[in-house]
Amino acid sequence: EDEADPNSKNDFGMNIIPALLRDGRKMYAYHFNGYWRDVGTIDSLWEANMEVLDPENSGIDIFDEKWKIYSRNPVLPAQKIGPRAVVQDSLVTEGCQIYGCVKHSVLSAGVVVEEGATVEDAVLMDGVVVKAGAVVKRCILAENVVVGAGAKVGGDGPIAHVGTGLTIGAGATVKEGAKVFDSVKEGEEV
């Protein structure tokens, strides 16, 4: 029902649970001692991904054998790390090709970071391509985004977000904190 409501943000705390209460439906609580984070915003999704990179302070150890991860990863070849690539404190999934610099970031399946490109404190979803000389910092790039050569996305401030399937043209700039839902032309600043 909530999914069909165009006015709903499809949020458990804001929409779904209050609607169940209004309808007089039975609900039960469960005391959960493990890690949980509401990732209903772009910023909270970014924060949760950064916490995975810091198991000592977050308590999240994805390599703990007792903590099962159930997923359906695509069948892709192993990661390719180029001869001049730098990868530090990051999670890199299958099919990624890294020839540039990746620091403190989470890269989903099939991401390509070309030589001379820099990715830092970022979450890159499936199929993202970061072209040579581009800089991507403190942002989330949705699926199949292409960041053109020499482009800059994000900065040191608030998290930037680029929507699914968009192209950030060569030499373009997406400022920190920007929410981009249309492609950005070559050299343009948003």
Language-model features: where?
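Left-handed beta-helix
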Residues: 2-190
